[in-house]
Amino acid sequence: MNCYLCRQDFLPGWTLSNVWTSQTLCPTCKIEFVKRGECGGCEDCGKPGLPLCPDCQNWRNQGRRLVTHPLFLYQTQAKAFMKRYKFLGDTALLDVFKTELKKVKVKQDWIVPIPLSPERLRERRFNQAELIARMMRGRVRLVLERTDGVAFSHQTRHERLERDNPYHVIQPVTGKTILLVDDVYTTGITLHQAASRLYEAGAKEISAVTLFRSV
């Protein structure tokens, strides 16, 4: 069979324990996806290194702690994946992570993907965070909307931290335990802004899951 990512032929290593598991990556590509849990790091965002990174310490000092569970580190092969999935629209490639996403067990009433602006959604035609969320076990609810069209990838770190909060809650969330979902955790500003709006609207507890954590 062909590897979903590098498209090279490989022979799946079937065993009694994985015979019902989809093997979509060749061994070479698979080994390059480093699971966040294998490297320790920040207990709030998964950044490799210190038990609590400076960014998360700063969030805590502001009274805005948010525990995020990234599945993998954002390294070379992960970047190649995101280029094809997010920017080239190869959404079928997400099947690579179906098994890992189904394993996620975080307390929640609703799974809430980070939304795109209407302009960005028309341009891309899909929300990459929503597709990730729908592969997880739980009830997905689109309770947030985003009203600007400025992509964070085109902003400096200072601009990301200083900009106005673009998110708005469009459905009642009072008393709900919410699991936010996004594709890549970089500075944390996206998830923290979304969480802030949800808390303002009455959410009880919020945590997050991302597919990748930048390093």
Language model features with spans:
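Glycine-rich phosphate/pyrophosphate-handling loop used in enzymes and phosphotransfer proteins
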Residues: M1-V215
